[in-house]
Swiss-Prot record:
Prevents the cell division inhibition by proteins MinC and MinD at internal division sites while permitting inhibition at polar sites. This ensures cell division at the proper site by restricting the formation of a division septum at the midpoint of the long axis of the cell. This is Cell division topological specificity factor. Belongs to the MinE family. Gene3D superfamilies: Cell division topological specificity factor MinE. It comes from Deinococcus deserti (strain DSM 17065 / CIP 109153 / LMG 22923 / VCD115). Coiled coil: none annotated. One of its GO terms (biological process) is cell division. NCBIfam families: minE.
């Protein structure tokens, strides 16, 4: 019905993905390294806090490549594993 709206979002999504690929390339980050870092970061944070949906991204900001982590903390206390 509103295909023109969908196309606009697809264009923006494609642009965002291209910017991300270029940032990875400029920072010389090997494939899979960001995913491994994301998993490690979330594992450490989840030891101390319950978390919701999170995102870890790399962005190009001028001459710098920036790692952005958005990790919302849930209200419920974390489940501690007994040793």
């Amino acid at each position: 019905m509103f295909s023109w709206m969908k196309r606009g979002r697809s264009k923006e999504t494609l642009k965002d993905r291209l910017e991300l690929v270029l940032a990875y390339d400029r920072a010389q980050i090997p494939p899979g390294k960001v995913d491994a870092l994301r998993n490690d970061l979330l594992e450490v944070v989840r030891r101390y806090f319950p978390t919701g949906n999170s995102s870890v991204e790399i962005e190009q900001r001028g001459d710098m490549v920036v790692l952005m982590a958005n990790i919302p903390i849930d209200d419920t206390p974390p489940v501690r594993k007994s040793s």
